[in-house]
Amino acid sequence: RPANPDLLPERLWNYELSYSQRLLKGTFYYGVNFFYINGDNMIQTIRTDGRPLNVNTGKVENWGAEADIAYHIHPMWRLTANYSWLHMEHPLIAAPEHKLYTGIDFTQKKWSFSTGIQYVTGLYTAVDPQEKKENFLLWNLRGSYRICSIADLFVKGENLLAQRYEINAGYPMPKATCMGGININF
């Protein structure tokens, strides 16, 4: 159990400045966001004697920027991309320095398909006693068919390149996975 009775409450201030706009009769969207985060007593789970333990990690001071775009190149096709950059004075577990995503969506009547590639670099999986970072590339794919007004059949594949990576040290993420099912919306 990661329980720790000596934990102090987290304190955090977050400042953001963002701008977004739609152009070309709503077919093109872009946005940018700048942020600054300052806090202390952040809680993270670390491994102590092979077991997880929640601890206060001290200060956090991050700043960065995010940008995203989307463009309907055709009524059935949409391109999307986003990028985020994060500078960390005090590294945090599961926080990447850079993340880039690009994808394409297709929708026609009852059919919907999407695919995208995500590149992550400088993701901290451990910070104590020694910093450890991961870099990886993921490819995901999803398709669905609307069978009625409240239900969709779906199939999806995640990490289709079967990348070996961890978000938290000691906990490997699954390689390629596929699943299907029914989504019911009430």
Identify the residue ranges that each predicted region occupies.
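Outer-membrane beta-barrel proteins
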Residues: 3-9, 20, 53-57, 69, ...
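Residues that define the transmembrane beta-barrel architecture of outer-membrane proteins
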Residues: 11-15, 36, 59-63, 96-100, ...
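A generic beta-sheet turn/junction motif
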Residues: 23-25, 106-110, 149, 186
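Residues on the lipid-exposed face of transmembrane beta-strands in outer-membrane beta-barrel proteins
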Residues: 17-21, 65-71, 81, 102-106, ...
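Membrane-embedded beta-barrel scaffold of Gram-negative outer-membrane proteins
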Residues: 9-63
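Gram-negative outer-membrane beta-barrel transporters
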Residues: 31-40, 55-123, 152, 161
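C-terminal beta-signal and adjacent terminal beta-strands/loops
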Residues: 38-40, 74, 119-126, 141-186
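Outer-membrane beta-barrel translocator domains and adjoining extracellular loop/strand segments
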Residues: 1-2, 42-50, 82, 86-95, ...
